Amino acid sequence: GFNPCGETCWNKPTCHAPGCTCSIANICVRN
């Protein structure tokens, strides 16, 4: 399925998509 938080966050502390947060695996997931 479509993941609106599909960006990764290895090199940046935040996710750009609204309602998303950086998971422990350095992937943006729904907050």
UniProtKB/Swiss-Prot annotation:
Q: Which organism is it from?
A: Psychotria brachyceras
Cross-link Cyclopeptide (Gly-Asn), sequence positions: G1-N31
Question: Known InterPro entries for this protein?
Answer: Cyclotide, Cyclotide_sf
Protein family (similarity comment): Belongs to the cyclotide family.
Record-level GO BP terms: defense response
Give a short account of its post-translational modification.
This is a cyclic peptide.
Q: Does the keyword Protease apply?
A: no
Q: Which UniProt keywords apply?
A: Disulfide bond, Knottin, Plant defense
This chain's protein is named Cyclotide psybry B
Notes on the domains: The presence of a 'disulfide through disulfide knot' structurally defines this protein as a knottin.
Q: What does this protein do?
A: Probably participates in a plant defense mechanism.
The record's Pfam families line, in alphabetical order, gives: Cyclotide (PF03784)
Q: Which cysteines are joined by disulfide bonds?
A: C5-C20, C9-C22, C15-C28
